[in-house]
Amino acid sequence: MSTPRVMVGVSGGVDSSVAAWRLVQQGEAVAGLFMQNWADDGSGECRAEDDRRDAVAVCGLLGIPFHFRDFSNEYWQGVFEHFLAEYAAGRTPNPDVLCNREVKFKHFLDAARELGAERIATGHYARVAQRGHQWLLLRGADRSKDQSYFLHQLGQQQLAATLFPIGDLEKTDLRRIARDVSLPTHAKKDSTGICFIGERDFREFLGRYLPAKPGQILDPADGSVIAEHPGVFYFTLGQREGLNIGGVRGRPAAPWYVVGKDVASNVLYVDQDRDSTWMLSNRLRSETAHWIAGAPPARRFECTAQTRYRQPDEPCTVEVLDDGSVLVTFARPQRAVTPGQSLVLYDGDVCLGGAVIAATDAPLEQRLRTTPSPFEVIAA
């Protein structure tokens, strides 16, 4: 068996299957590696065994070696423990970003090199380009599927060793290729959500690790009690589904939206205005920012930002602070910018990097704050 030059992360899905097929067609010495990132908990909801069988079938059809690695311990320590800690603190984390940084482009890359591969490849909708001595992360050609948002924590060494073989494809073209070459995964549905939750009810799953208690749902304007919630951990800013608020005397028969939560007092705040001013922000401050180039383009610059996946680009001004965090000022007010989620910055199609959102200047968030406002500290 020849040593592979490229190790493809085969997930058992159609995207990684076509990625592997394209590399084989290009004459690369390819092998596939399936990562198990979540230990089977007996629920039958995380279909790792089905995915592994599909990955084996794809590698068999393509005539490439198949490898397996169990990264469930690494995932638990590097991703899941952080996921739980963030929810316990009342924030809304993004485990896919951490999974890419801590598992797929760290432990998978290490395993590939141990097996003799020079580079890795995945089925992400993104592109890599080289400009001089610098490696760039670019959005995928299919903007509706672009996954650069989840890859913004990658660095120069990782990008130099990474291929994204399907980054130039539209999803419809990828499906057609998979069907035309009879890949076993050509009709397989795209995976959605978080693997360790699968098809389970999110509240049921989270409740196994973070026991929650019921509390009051209040109107932030007058403090009146609207209803009762099953646990503040289960809700995020801007959320409408799952509140189960029936008719409220003296209130219109209209939907309610989460506009804030106070973990310390176990209170959820709601409003009937989808774009409630309680959760509109003009500025945010981040945790320490990561720059794909190794440094920011300037101490102060203009670019566009996304504060959630698939959000339209929003023009903003970025100021890099002395502690490595960034202060972002948006050109227009933003709805439901959520601490714990990822701020990702772009210059056109080039992903500059990003950071975890630490705080915003939304009125209700500022009112509930028990520590000095990070914006007042800057002003001082």
Curated annotation (Swiss-Prot):
Recorded catalytic activity of this chain's protein: S-sulfanyl-L-cysteinyl-[protein] + uridine(34) in tRNA + AH2 + ATP = 2-thiouridine(34) in tRNA + L-cysteinyl-[protein] + A + AMP + diphosphate + H(+)
InterPro entries named in the record: MnmA-like, MnmA-like_C, MnmA-like_central, MnmA-like_central_sf, Rossmann-like_a/b/a_fold
Alphabetized SUPFAM superfamilies for the sequence: Adenine nucleotide alpha hydrolases-like (SSF52402)
Region (Interaction with target base in tRNA): 94-96
Positions of region (Interaction with tRNA): 145-147, 308-309
CDD domains attached to this UniProt entry: MnmA_TRMU-like
Superkingdom of origin: Bacteria
Site residues, Interaction with tRNA: 124, 341
Spans traversing the lipid bilayer: none
Entry keyword Cytoplasm: yes
GO cellular component, one term: cytoplasm
Main localisation: cytoplasm
The protein's role, per its UniProt record: Catalyzes the 2-thiolation of uridine at the wobble position (U34) of tRNA, leading to the formation of s(2)U34.
Protein name (Swiss-Prot/TrEMBL): tRNA-specific 2-thiouridylase MnmA
Source organism per UniProt: Stenotrophomonas maltophilia (strain R551-3)
Annotated gene: mnmA
